[in-house]
C-alpha cells in the first residue's frame, strides 16, 4: 500500500482490540532459536516485522506454522542451517543483531550479521551489544559489511555493567548469557515490560533468571531446555496510539486488552494535558473530556519513564493543546525530524540542540536536535506527507484525521504495516474515511 488519502474532520468512535506486542513477539521468535525444542506463541500480531522475523527464522532452519486467524505460531529449529544472515533481512529492521547472542551457543565458530536497517531515527550504536558480548568471551570483528561473532571455546558468565540501559543490548546479552557457562550479572539493564516477557518465556524454557529493582538481571547458563507455550503481552504502543487518536479527534474509543499497569507514564502524561480515560476490567476507554492544556514537559526515558515510541503521536496532541509545551527526547538522537511534517500542516514547532530540561541527557554535548517547543492550539491543514518511520507514520495519520481543508495524501504507509495490525481496517471501523490508491471514489 504505497499511499492513502485521509479525509479530515473525523471523530473516532467505537472499540478496537489491541494486538500482541511487536517488540515482544519478534524477540521471542529469536529466543526460540536457542534450542531445538518446540515453542508455541499465542496472541501473535499479524504485522510485517513479525513476518520478516518468521522468514528469517525459516531461512536459518526453523520449521514454522503460523495460523494468522488463530494468532498462533508453532516453531522449532532442529538445526541451524546458516551462519550468515541473508542481507535482505538486515536491511528491514534491527532484529538480526540479536542472533549474535542467540546463536553463539549453537554456532560457536561464527555468526555474521550484515549492516542493519530499520527506522531512520538515528544511528543507534551497537557498541553496548558488542562490548558486552566480548566480556562473555566472544570474538567480535566489525567491518563495513557487518558484524561477525564467534566463541569457539564457549561463552563464560561475567559481570557486565551497561553504560546506558539499552533495550537491544540487554536482550542480546540475556540471550547470549543463556548459552554461557556459569552465572552472568547484567547491571543497569533495561527492564521494559517486553524484556520481562522475554524473561518469563526463558524461565518457562528452563532458564534460571531473576531481576532486581536496581536494574540488575542474573542469568545462569542453561543446557537442558523445555518446550514452551506462551501468550504474548498486549502492545502498549498500539494501545496508546489509538488512545491518542481518540482524544485528538474529540471522540471516544475503547481499547480492548490495553493494560493499565504497562501504560502508567503515558496515562499520567495524557491526564496532565486534560485527556480523558477510564480504566476498565478488560481494557481502557479513551475520550475527549475538555480542551487540552499544554504547558508541559514531555521527557522520554527508558522504563519506567515515558517511552520514546509514545512521543511522536503525543506531539500531535500537544499541537492541539493550549500553551507552550516542551519535548525532550533522551533515547534517540534523531527522532524529531518528523516535526517538519507537522509544521507543513501548520503546527508551530521549534527544534533545539540543547536539553530543554533541568536534566541533561547523553546528547547534551552533541550536535543533535533532540528538544522541541510546540505552541498550541494550532489548526492543522491537509497536505501531502511522506512517512519517515513507523511511529511518525501514525502521528501523521492522526494529524490528517483532524486536518482542515479537505484531504491529506500520505505516502510510504508500508511503514505502518511493520507495527500495527490491520491499522487501516481498525481506523475505518472507528469512522475514519481513508482511501487507498486501489479504492475508487464513487
From Swiss-Prot:
It is found in: Cytoplasm. It catalyses: phosphoenolpyruvate + UDP-N-acetyl-alpha-D-glucosamine = UDP-N-acetyl-3-O-(1-carboxyvinyl)-alpha-D-glucosamine + phosphate. Keywords: Cell cycle, Cell division, Cell shape, Cell wall biogenesis/degradation, Cytoplasm, Peptidoglycan synthesis, Transferase. GO terms for biological process: cell division; cell wall organization; peptidoglycan biosynthetic process; regulation of cell shape; UDP-N-acetylgalactosamine biosynthetic process. SUPFAM superfamilies: EPT/RTPC-like. Pathway: Cell wall biogenesis; peptidoglycan biosynthesis. The active site is at residue 119. UDP-N-acetyl-alpha-D-glucosamine binds at residues 94, 309, 331. One of its GO terms (cellular component) is cytoplasm. Phosphoenolpyruvate binds at residues 22-23. GO terms for molecular function: UDP-N-acetylglucosamine 1-carboxyvinyltransferase activity. Belongs to the EPSP synthase family. MurA subfamily. HAMAP family: MurA. Cell wall formation. Adds enolpyruvyl to UDP-N-acetylglucosamine. This is UDP-N-acetylglucosamine 1-carboxyvinyltransferase.
Amino acid at each position: 500500500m504505497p499511499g492513502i488519502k485521509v479525509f479530515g474532520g473525523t471523530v473516532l468512535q467505537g472499540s478496537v482490540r489491541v494486538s500482541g506486542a511487536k517488540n515482544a513477539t519478534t524477540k521471542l521468535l529469536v529466543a526460540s532459536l536457542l534450542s531445538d525444542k518446540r515453542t508455541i506463541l499465542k496472541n501473535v500480531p499479524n504485522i510485517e516485522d513479525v513476518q520478516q522475523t518468521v522468514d528469517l527464522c525459516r531461512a536459518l532452519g526453523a520449521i514454522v506454522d503460523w495460523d494468522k486467524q488463530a494468532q498462533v505460531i508453532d516453531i522449532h529449529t532442529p538445526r541451524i542451517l546458516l551462519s550468515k544472515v541473508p542481507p535482505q533481512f538486515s536491511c528491514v529492521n534491527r532484529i538480526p543483531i540479536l542472533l549474535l547472542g542467540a546463536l553463539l551457543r549453537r554456532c560457536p565458530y561464527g555468526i555474521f550479521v550484515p549492516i542493519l536497517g530499520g527506522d531512520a531515527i538515528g544511528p543507534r550504536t551497537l557498541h553496548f551489544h558488542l562490548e558486552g558480548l566480548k566480556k562473555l568471551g566472544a570474538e567480535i570483528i566489525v567491518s563495513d559489511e557487518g558484524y561477525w561473532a564467534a566463541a569457539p571455546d564457549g561463552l563464560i558468565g561475567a559481570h557486565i555493567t551497561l553504560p546506558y540501559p539499552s533495550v537491544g543490548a540487554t536482550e542480546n546479552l540475556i540471550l547470549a548469557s543463556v548459552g554461557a557457562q556459569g552465572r552472568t550479572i547484567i547491571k543497569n539493564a533495561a527492564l521494559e515490560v517486553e524484556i520481562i516477557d522475554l524473561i518469563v518465556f526463558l524461565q518457562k524454557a528452563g532458564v534460571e533468571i531473576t531481576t532486581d529493582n536496581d536494574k540488575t538481571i542474573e542469568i545462569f547458563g542453561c543446557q537442558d531446555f523445555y518446550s514452551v507455550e506462551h501468550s504474548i503481552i498486549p502492545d502498549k504502543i498500539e494501545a496508546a496510539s489509538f488512545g491518542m487518536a481518540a482524544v485528538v479527534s474529540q471522540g471516544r474509543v475503547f481499547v480492548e486488552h490495553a493494560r493499565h499497569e504497562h501504560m502508567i507514564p503515558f496515562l499520567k502524561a495524557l491526564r496532565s494535558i486534560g485527556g480523558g480515560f477510564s480504566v476498565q476490567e478488560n481494557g481502557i476507554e479513551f475520550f475527549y473530556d475538555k480542551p487540552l492544556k499544554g504547558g508541559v514537559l514531555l521527557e522520554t526515558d527508558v522504563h519506567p519513564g515515558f517511552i520514546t515510541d509514545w512521543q511522536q503521536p503525543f506531539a500531535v496532541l500537544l499541537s492541539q493543546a493550549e500553551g507552550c509545551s516542551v519535548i525532550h527526547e533522551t533515547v534517540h538522537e534523531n527522532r524529531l525530524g518528523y516535526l517538519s511534517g507537522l509544521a507543513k500542516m501548520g503546527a508551530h514547532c521549534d527544534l533545539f540542540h540543547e536539553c530543554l530540561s533541568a536534566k541533561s541527557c547523553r546528547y547534551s554535548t552533541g550536535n543533535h536536535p533532540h528538544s522541541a517547543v510546540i505552541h498550541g492550539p494550532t489548526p492543522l491543514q491537509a497536505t501531502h506527507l511522506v512517512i519517515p518511520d513507523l511511529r511518525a507514520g501514525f502521528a501523521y495519520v492522526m494529524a490528517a484525521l483532524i486536518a482542515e481543508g479537505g484531504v491529506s495524501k500520505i505516502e510510504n504507509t508500508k511503514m505502518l504495516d511493520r507495527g500495527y495490525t490491520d491499522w487501516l481496517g481498525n481506523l475505518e471501523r472507528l469512522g475514519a474515511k481513508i482511501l487507498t490508491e486501489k479504492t475508487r471514489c464513487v
